[in-house]
Amino acid sequence: MTGSAPRTARERARAEITAEILDAARGYLATDGAPALSLRAIARDLGMASSALYRYFKSRDELLTRLIIDAYDSLGAAAEACEGTIDRNDLAGRFAATCSAVRDWALAHPNEYALIYGSPVPGYAAPADTVRPASRVTTLLLRITVEAAAAGRVPEEDIKDAEAEPVAAAIAPIRSYLPPGVPAPLVQRALMVWTNLFGVVSFELFGQLHNVVAEPRAGRDAFFAECIRRWTTFITGPTVSS
């Protein structure tokens, strides 16, 4: 079996310095926010010449893009790992695990979450290569939705919706990043839950639930658990008692 060639000393050094730059940038996200991110300031903090840092990232926007992709991939990996521990036939359990993993990741990584789901960074336009990483959770929710429909858990009229053509046109931008052949109403169904999920998580992280949901954490936990229960019924159908 042929393995990959070992990295050269130069490649290892580049990887280490790149990691240091990204760590420093995440520090700025925590203390100053994404709009204040500056390659010159990071270079100064790392004891590097600005010209040297530009050999790793050509611009602030390129660094932001890397941070955004890394954050989306970290979130997606966390959701996929949690969902992957649940029995494949337990659609409700897989859906609930995905939702819980999203919230847990967001609470553990508030600055990265704010970067990808908070206020847009002035002057920055995310390139197309951020879309696929951003779609990982959506794809996971869609997969569960499709399996629920195949198992007869989604009403037939919801799959063959009379409004399918307008829906298909409306969601055309995201469909190219999702598994092909899925009926538009099912994509719409998954997107509805996706926006609900991230809306609730964003409200919690950004303080909009203050004076709405009881503190301490137990109150927010109970509120989120009830949201999951209702979303699960929408996606996988009502729980069948044994």
Name every feature range the model reports, one short phrase each.
Residues 81-89, 121-124:
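Helix-loop segments that flank and shape redox-cofactor active sites
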Residues 1-32, 36-41, 45, 58-65, ...:
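Basic, helix-initiating cap at the start of DNA-binding domains
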Residues 117-130, 211-218:
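Short helix/strand-bridging catalytic loops that position acidic/His residues to coordinate divalent metals
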Residues 2, 139, 143-242:
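C-terminal peripheral helix-coil segments that are non-catalytic and often amphipathic
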Residues 30, 76, 80, 103-107, ...:
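Short amphipathic alpha-helical interface segments enriched in basic and hydrophobic/aromatic residues
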Residues 48-57:
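Short hydrophobic/aromatic patch on the recognition helix
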Residues 16, 20-27, 62-82, 97-104, ...:
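Alpha-helical structural segments
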Residues 23, 92-111, 135, 139-149, ...:
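Amphipathic alpha-helical segments that line or abut small-molecule/effector binding pockets
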